[in-house]
Amino acid sequence: MKKKIFVFMFLMLLVIGVSSSYAYLKAEKGSTGNNNLSVGSLDVTLLTDISNINLNNEIPKEDSEGLKNPSTSFRIKNNAGMTASYKISLVDGTKKSTVSNKDVKYRLIRTNANTNETVTMDIKNLDSTGLIDTGTIEANVIYNYQLVIWLDINSNPNGLVFSKNILVEGMQVSSLDKSGANYPELTDNMIPVYYDKASDTEGVWRVADRKNLNETYKWFDYNDFMWANAVTVKENGTTSRSDYLKADLGTEVKMEDITTMWVWIPRYKYQIFNGNNELSNEQEIKITFEHGIDKTGTVSCKENILTANDSSSSETCTDTINGSIINNKSTYTHPAFTFGDEELTGIWYAKFEMSTDQDSVCATSQSYDNCDKEDLNVYVKPDHISLRYQKLMNEFKSIRNMELFNNIHGFIQNENATTSSQTGEITNDDNNIDIHMQKNMEWGAVTYLAYSKYGKYGNSLYTGTNKRVYKNNWYQQLSSVYNYKTGYSGYSYNAAPSTTNVVLYNDLTDLGSGNGYKGAGASTTGTVYGIYDMNGGAYEYVMGNMVNSSGAFYSHNAGFTASPLAKYYDKYSYYSTKSLAQASVSRGRFGDATKETTKGYVESTGSWEGSYRIFPYYGFSWSTRGGRASISSYSGINDLISLNGYSTIFNSSRPVLAVSREFPWLSE
């Protein structure tokens, strides 16, 4: 039997000093008992006095019992004439807690008092940051909160004390983007950029206004197909990294200095359009950007991995609001924004397929001996020979190694974090970010956004089949060497392989007649701000793995001798033979752009865009996406084939960057 312990809950606002007009909010205790928060023209008020709340004689409890604990109610109001971003955290005050955050569970309910919209958040263990809510609040809006806290049934904090303050922090938010997309979360080494067109075929990237308030240096506008872009640079190029990071707005960031280019995919929910494992045709996918880390979709799914020879599903999904999953009514918070146990406000997706140093022996003399390694530097840039000839495990580790100490990109890391393992773990990792090989679900998140009103499918420059992402058809065979280059366009979705009938990603020649831009038509937006190489280029391995007949991780020829942590791959049920039947296709999962975007139970034209649809099966346990340039047709961003994980001349991949739930506070 658990012993009772005394837990003292002291919740109040922590006073934070103001250092600039975009600094943290300052909390002041008023004579009426109210707590006012203000900074410059930003004024958010806590309307409830919660300076003394006690939770006495608390014992560890099951969730069902913990939810019966008394709730703490509080309200915040945005009195400013502009939208504000905020985060609410439980933090140590004068009296430091001795109970670990992970031993404390909570449930938060937020109601918009102006619209009566209520969001009941998932029950969670308090994370190391203490963050319980983050997002935006419109001018003159009131949010009502109910917070319930209890001790995890598996904890044993005998005789310890849990004492926390409520910390509310805020800042003015972008006024140039009206889509509702979450603000991009930049790491310390990332530079926000916009494209400055000099001519139809030339232009440069320049430092954007990270506050997104200055039209001249606008960073992003999802309503206008301008997804947020950011780059990392060399420590010492034509300009040093430190100088770039403090450079004036509009400063050119030279391509020769760039090491990686990223595009922000904000958290969203989408309307289910094919929830019954049926066939579907290309259509707009209706997307709503979500607030902070809200999970407002009506559908929830749980993994259900089967091992029978003819398994027909990989998950069980329900809609408790509508009673059942209903096409064009049920909604689903895209699962790509759940990373392990953590909810994300968005992800940074590599703008191009990965490459390596173009002067390296791997790039100049491609072979399995020269490239099938785990210690190659990964770049993400256009007009590069893509990195191939690696077995999947070496792709996985090369990408994880991008955040090791002293990496070429400037990602901050502990000086003792010098090695990674096949599980994906990095020794002494404490940098609050995670760079990992793309997962099947993350590919799906980009694909669905491309098919939304915010992507190329919604871009009026393109009509008919031109709404499909154009193919990167750059392909060259020199004897036994096969070359694929990043960031090219064949200015049609099914362009034949070539090195001449191609243009670079930033060719903005308008072809007219609904054909749109010659080069940018190969991006997910139909503009220079989207993601490239998702149709054609090299095949791209994704971390989507079919289990073996025992239900275990199935490396096959990928090179793994240990299973990666669960957060690093998407798992699918077993199937013994290659099959185009509905049962095999039904092993896809909501959001991964497989079963929902199947238009026929045929191999070569089974998915949207008329591209391949071959699900993993025994001997071919890994998923590969996007087709390749060397195939004359049958490519597309919904393309799926299965391979065994071995190194090939055709396969590349790309990284994804997840930033832990730290809010992007901006300095002056």
Residue ranges of predicted features:
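Short aromatic-cysteine micro-motif
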Residues: 252-259, 296-534
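Extracellular adhesion/glycan-binding regions together with long Ser/Thr-
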Residues: 56-63, 114-144, 148
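C-terminal, surface-exposed recognition/capping segments
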Residues: 441-444, 462, 471-500, 509-511, ...
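N-terminal module-boundary/linker segments of secreted carbohydrate-active enzymes
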Residues: 181-330, 665-667
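C-terminal, structured domain-capping segment
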Residues: 66-92, 132-183
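Short, polar/proline-rich extracytoplasmic segments that appear immediately after membrane translocation
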Residues: 2-64, 158-162, 167-183
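A surface/secretory-pathway sequence property marking extracellular, secreted
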Residues: 40-49, 91-129
